[in-house]
Amino acid sequence: MYRSGERLLGSHALPAEQRDFLPLETTNNNNNHHQPGAWARRAGSSASSPPSASSSPHPSAAVPAADPADSASGSSNKRKRDNKASGGRAAGGGRADGGGVVYSGTPWKRRNYNQGVVGLHEEISDFYEYMSPRPEEEKMRMEVVNRIESVIKELWPSADVQIFGSFKTGLYLPTSDIDLVVFGKWENLPLWTLEEALRKHKVADEDSVKVLDKATVPIIKLTDSFTEVKVDISFNVQNGVRAADLIKDFTKKYPVLPYLVLVLKQFLLQRDLNEVFTGGIGSYSLFLMAVSFLQLHPREDACIPNTNYGVLLIEFFELYGRHFNYLKTGIRIKDGGSYVAKDEVQKNMLDGYRPSMLYIEDPLQPGNDVGRSSYGAMQVKQAFDYAYVVLSHAVSPIAKYYPNNETESILGRIIRVTDEVATYRDWISKQWGLKNRPEPSCNGPVSSSSATQSSSSDVDSDATPCKTPKQLLCRPSTGNRVGSQDVSLESSQAVGKMQSTQTTNTSNSTNKSQHGSARLFRSSSKGFQGTTQTSHGSLMTNKQHQGKSNNQYYHGKKRKHKRDAPLSDLCR
């Protein structure tokens, strides 16, 4: 089974003034910000610890103010230690060095990009391609679902188990949880009955099974004992499945949404601002915020595939980090989208009048405020504002004059992938990328239907212990990229098909540059134009920029790793 490493920063609070992310390079000059996880040493890794954990930024680089999320989230928090994407050593696509791989925190960056927002667009495309679910990751998750479903079917043979959330829509990160809903007929929700059965069958880690019976939607939270995938189980909740269908519909209308959402989810995840249970903004709320942004955005081409992702990302951060009035304004996406006055709408809420920092009307149930539990919305707002300042500076015309702009990552200034996440994905590829991966015998009995859908098992008849990363550890490699796969939701038959497509999806199409890219991003000295305030304090953007021709936007097609002619290097 997979076991993540100990948090070396767990007993040391991060300094309040620590900068968020320093300029990242593909050399080992910046790999000393975090020490490697302890599990790597237990696994026999020959990589030595970096010489220092307090590296300073490049002396010539202008670094904006510290990310407010750093000072507000101490690493002693257990939730943060459980988050593979938060803290830890940054992983990346570096060069091989001795017995290991040198990481830089940006494994998606395999080449130099154009300058400015065109380069940011290219990098967002590569990030999406790298972070999108791989076939073996979907296969692993389906096996987790099958194991849990077998326990549920043993208790209630007529129960119906369905997947919803990011796993159903395909917009999940490598460490995202799985959302399951169980439909059946019970007088009282059988939370504790299922909790006892999951413990009995050893499907989950003993300490990870928790029953949140007092929550708005009562759920069971657990961590799969073999894969460390987190699972939330609810009962008789219809809206979750309907919301997944709604997300798919909007994704078809706005092809840019998956690119924005994956970047934003990673941005919040590594700052521990993504859990509604702790006041953060959940995936559904974040998606609706992105939809509202695109609906009310001044660009007419926001719904066509070749929109510049870099421009949209920066303007998203500008809107929700700088201009949006969280105190007075609510978000509504029905009927083309609009802003609403919170004090008027909340009087008609299902739960009565409740002060809500972030009001987002549920399009499936207008009387429901899906953002009412996000009491940490102001902290998210500050993080968005920070990202806006950082990215605006990085794509400005003067950024090309900074040292090391040929190798530094623009997107890596606000997000990065930890060593732990990269190695976790390698472990998944090694386990589920094989044709005959042994089914873990230590997770209790699995139903015959689940066993049929999973790969064949070669585990010894005397219950050989499950293999762990200590036994299966391979050198981290992020060279092969697989595009996002749409999760099969009706059955797990698609799991077997994913294996045959694993090698065919690794090639990329050629990337084309467009003229006029220098005009894509408005000068930071002038600021973003065309914003007015409504009577309710919300940001309403005018149509000044709708007239821009589509050829001003970078054509967002996939690319090969190598280009025929060298282009301008990535700016800071």
Swiss-Prot record:
Q: Which residues form the PAP-associated domain?
A: 308-368
Keyword Nucleotide-binding (UniProt) = yes
What is catalysed by this protein? RNA(n) + ATP = RNA(n)-3'-adenine ribonucleotide + diphosphate
The record's InterPro entries line, in alphabetical order, gives: MTPAP-like_central, NT_sf, PAP_assoc, Trf4-like
Q: Does the keyword Heme apply?
A: no
Low complexity biased stretches: 36-76, 446-464, 499-514
Give GO cellular component annotations, separated by semicolons: cytoplasm; cytosol; nucleolus; plasma membrane; TRAMP complex
One GO term in the molecular function aspect is: RNA binding
Output compositional bias ranges, type Polar residues: 25-34, 477-494, 522-553
**Which keywords label this protein?**
ATP-binding, Cell cycle, Cell division, Cytoplasm, Isopeptide bond, Magnesium, Manganese, Metal-binding, Mitosis, mRNA processing, Nucleotide-binding, Nucleotidyltransferase, Nucleus, Phosphoprotein, RNA-binding, rRNA processing, Transferase, Ubl conjugation
Which residues make up the binding site for Mg(2+)? 177, 179
- Record-annotated residues binding ATP? 240, 265, 283-284, 368, 372
According to the UniProt entry, where does the motif Basic, involved in binding of the RNA primer sit in this chain? Answer: 557-563
Region annotation Disordered: residue ranges?
Answer: 1-105, 435-572
Identify the EC number(s).
2.7.7.19, 2.7.7.-
Gly residues composition bias: residue spans: 89-102
Give cross-link positions for Glycyl lysine isopeptide (Lys-Gly) (interchain with G-Cter in SUMO2): 470, 497, 512, 526
Pfam families, per database record? MTPAP-like_central, PAP_assoc
- Record PTM Phosphoserine, positions in chain: 484
**So what does this one do?**
Terminal nucleotidyltransferase that catalyzes preferentially the transfer of ATP and GTP on RNA 3' poly(A) tail creating a heterogeneous 3' poly(A) tail leading to mRNAs stabilization by protecting mRNAs from active deadenylation. Also functions as a catalytic subunit of a TRAMP-like complex which has a poly(A) RNA polymerase activity and is involved in a post-transcriptional quality control mechanism. Polyadenylation with short oligo(A) tails is required for the degradative activity of the exosome on several of its nuclear RNA substrates.
Q: Record's family?
A: Belongs to the DNA polymerase type-B-like family.
PANTHER family listed in its UniProt record: POLY(A) RNA POLYMERASE, TERMINAL NUCLEOTIDYLTRANSFERASE 4B
Return the protein name.
Terminal nucleotidyltransferase 4B
